[in-house]
Amino acid sequence: VCSSDLVWRDGELTVRVAYSLCGMTDGKEFDEYQNYLAMMPQGFGDDMLHFNGIGERITWAMNSVGGKRPQTDKDTYYEIVRWAAGRGLAVTMHWNGDENVDELLGIWERVNREFPIRPLRWTIAHLNDASPGTLQRMKDLGVGWTVQDAMYNAGEEALDAAAAQRMPPVVTG
């Protein structure tokens, strides 16, 4: 038993925590998720600590690497997120570049045709250079968007001035 679990069980947790689980073993992620849920179903916990879903790395193969992914990687990813949607799980996906986010959104749109994802609060994390078209697709799906302060720290050099202009304002004080 970890110390944070004891703090929660003893009623001493002072902040609300919703946590996600990620696949730890390349190629065995789906088995891991199924085993997790067999032990700890969606909604585990209470108002202070509860299991929320899967992410930020759903599969190693789809974890925000550049370029196009093989179809087999996309098929495996689809099966996992479809399974998650069918169980009402939140999904958070780490994704860095707008240049190939079409792959991810295409899969999520496919899942959404069978299981609406809007009420599940799915999120793309770290998509620091989302284009207006990408943001519209995300809005249409009801997908959330989280960014890092990477754009505040040399964003124009990391991406380009146009990407930096699309970022929401960062409040620093």
Annotated model-derived regions:
Residues V1-S3:
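Short, small-residue-biased leader/transition segments that mark boundaries at the very start
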Residues D26-D31, A125-P132:
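Active-site glycine- and acidic-residue-rich loops that bind
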Residues D5-D102, G106, R110, R137-A150:
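Metal-coordinating catalytic core of metallo-dependent amide/deamination hydrolases
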Residues H94, R121-W122, H126:
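Histidine-centered active-site/metal-ligand motif
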Residues S64-D73, T123, L159-V171:
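Glycine-rich tight-turn/loop motif centered on a GG-T
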Residues D129-G173:
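Active-site-adjacent C-terminal substructures of enzyme catalytic domains
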